[in-house]
């Protein structure tokens, strides 16, 4: 399963661990993804999505109906 936020599109990114002696080793920065259930009043059902915490804040701000409409317009099956 991919580590991608359904709402924001956040993905893992690469970087370095840097020690006190400035030795660098490669690492991945993973997005803070959560499985979250949202109640969709217009459809009278729960929708379970894998979203980042920023995606949850976006849904709180815009509303789940607007976000779902944007995802469906982009061809996402929900």
Curated annotation (Swiss-Prot):
Keywords of this entry: Ribonucleoprotein, Ribosomal protein
Biological processes, Gene Ontology terms: translation
Protein name: Large ribosomal subunit protein bL28
Family indicated by similarity: Belongs to the bacterial ribosomal protein bL28 family.
Stored InterPro entries: Ribosomal_bL28, Ribosomal_bL28/bL31-like_sf, Ribosomal_bL28_bact-type, Ribosomal_bL28_sf
Originating organism: Acidithiobacillus ferrooxidans (strain ATCC 23270 / DSM 14882 / CIP 104768 / NCIMB 8455) (Ferrobacillus ferrooxidans (strain ATCC 23270))
Keyword Ribosomal protein: yes
Superkingdom field: Bacteria
């Amino acid at each position: 399963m991919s580590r991608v936020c359904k709402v924001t599109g956040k993905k893992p990114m690469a970087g370095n661990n840097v020690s006190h002696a400035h030795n660098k080793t490669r690492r991945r920065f993973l997005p803070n993804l959560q499985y979250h259930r949202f109640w969709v009043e217009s459809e009278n059902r729960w929708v379970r999505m894998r979203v980042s915490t920023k995606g949850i804040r976006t849904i709180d701000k815009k509303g789940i109906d607007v976000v779902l409409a944007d995802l469906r317009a982009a061809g996402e099956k929900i």
